[in-house]
Every structure is written in C-alpha cells, then in structure tokens.
Amino acid sequence: MQMNQVNDSLARIEQCTDQAVAAVRQAGQQAPDDLRQCVDQMHAQARDVRNLAKQSADEAQLTSRVDQLEQTGDRAKQACQRAGSALDPQLQSAVVQAHDAISNLKKQMH
C-alpha cells in the first residue's frame, strides 16, 4: 500500500473518530463510561498514528499501531453492542463507521 493511500485512510479515520467524539459529547450521560473511554482512546490513537505516518515510513511500526487502533475500535464497537437499544443511534453509527474505516485500513496493510 502506498504511503499517500495510508495517509488518506488515516485522515478519514481521524475524521470518523472526531465524529464519534462529538456524538459521545452529544449523548451526554446516555453514553456508558466504557464507551466514552474507548472513543477517547480511539481518537487519541488515530491522531498519533496519523502523526507517525507523516513523520516516518517505518511500515512495521505503522502496521503495529494500526493493529492496536483496531483493537481499541473493537472494544468501542463491543461497548456499543453491550449498551443495546438504549444507545443513541447517531453515536452507534459514528463508532461503527470509525471501526469499519480502521478495519479496512488494517486489511489493506496486511
């Protein structure tokens, strides 16, 4: 995968995690604490991975960080599933979109 494609994907992921953070804030107390923590962590990791990609072309390190980001995305998606129908649909959609974008990048990198 070309570095410019990785950077484009990471920009999309960061945008998706921005939307998830906004949805968590909008949901307020409806958002479970574990989901809130996962979304915050996913957002921070997405920003860190994007910065790493801009600074370095070390593919192995970048792949490892994307793998970690996907694990965080998995936890966020699972937290949404545990919350069930009580969760704001916009929040659930934002988390799923971020998770899917991360998963797609991981598949392309492996």
Residue ranges and their predicted role:
Residues 2-37:
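Short terminal alpha-helical segments
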Residues 3, 29-33, 59, 84-88, ...:
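Short, structured coil/loop segments at alpha-helix boundaries
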Residues 6, 10-13, 35, 39-42, ...:
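Hydrophobic packing residues in well-ordered alpha-helices of helical domains and bundles
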Residues 9-20, 41-48, 68, 72-75, ...:
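Amphipathic, well-ordered alpha-helical segments in soluble domains
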Residues 13, 20-23, 27, 49, ...:
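Alpha-helical solenoid scaffolds that mediate protein-protein interactions
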Residues 24-70:
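Amphipathic alpha-helical interaction modules
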